[in-house]
Regions:
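Non-catalytic alpha-helical scaffolds and adjoining flexible linkers that form interface surfaces
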Residues: 1-22, 26-241
Length: 241
């Protein structure tokens, strides 16, 4: 995909008046944007498809007094196949909500934008299992947000941990603890889970898979990220079990 200064993806919409919508866009160069899409709910509106969730395109905006109105859009992708699978659709909406929670207006969001795009593409167009895919997104999302989990050394004593030893994850401290230092509330991890996190931090979305030697601590990573958000995400309740 060729990215331009007008490239963005629709994270949220709210119906407004009889035929309009307020869109929340994520732009890699402009961050989170609130944009009015006039008349988009009319059946023959050229803005109809570009004003739906997941719509990715080049959005031409008219901006006056810090208010943005959508003039036209060149639609690049709709991720339409997500709508055929409720579980994957629920995961996709959760990804959009996480991106919205992290993005700020006027902020460069290139890393977050590409992370969202790559994960949505794998979710839509591959048969990759959704749990490790979402876990990988959460891991890189935390890293992009400045709270990358510490996975090589004990967060208490600082000792480098070996691949074979038992490990616990301290949600408050944001990293691994050794057997001698772990707090009572720390979450025990299997060596395969630690191995998965270390491997997944180094690779792209295609590597976020479970296998015999490594599998994702999905529930742990959800808890780790969600407790750092300013408010709960309602879409989290819709995630499949």
């Amino acid at each position: 995909m060729r990215q331009t200064e007008n490239t963005a993806i629709v994270l949220r919409y709210a119906n407004y008046r009889d035929h309009d919508r307020m869109l929340t866009l994520l732009s890699p160069t402009r961050g989170r944007m609130e944009v009015l899409s006039r008349g988009c709910r009319r059946p023959r509106s050229p803005l109809l498809n570009a004003s739906e969730l997941f719509a990715l395109g080049d959005f031409q905006l008219y901006i006056k007094q810090e208010r943005a109105t959508l003039v036209s859009a060149n639609l690049l992708e709709t991720f339409y196949l997500l709508r055929a699978d409720f579980d994957r659709l629920a995961v996709g909406v959760y990804l959009l909500n996480l991106a919205e929670a992290a993005a700020q207006p006027g902020q460069n969001c290139q890393e977050l934008f590409l992370l969202l795009l790559h994960t949505l593409s794998r979710l839509t167009f591959s048969d990759q299992e959704w749990k490790p895919l979402l876990a990988g997104f959460l891991l890189h999302y935390a890293a992009a947000g400045g709270y990358k989990p510490r996975l090589m050394h004990c967060v208490t004593c600082g000792r480098r941990m070996t691949p074979q030893e038992r490990a616990w994850f301290d949600l408050g401290e944001g990293g691994l603890s050794c057997e001698g230092c772990h707090a009572r509330q720390a979450v025990p991890l299997a060596p395969e889970q630690v191995r998965w996190m270390r491997r997944s931090l180094m690779g792209g979305a295609s590597t976020w898979v479970n296998d015999e030697e490594a599998y994702a601590p999905y529930v742990l990573l959800r808890d780790f990220v969600e407790r750092r958000l300013e408010r709960p995400l309602r879409s989290a309740a819709m995630l499949p079990k």
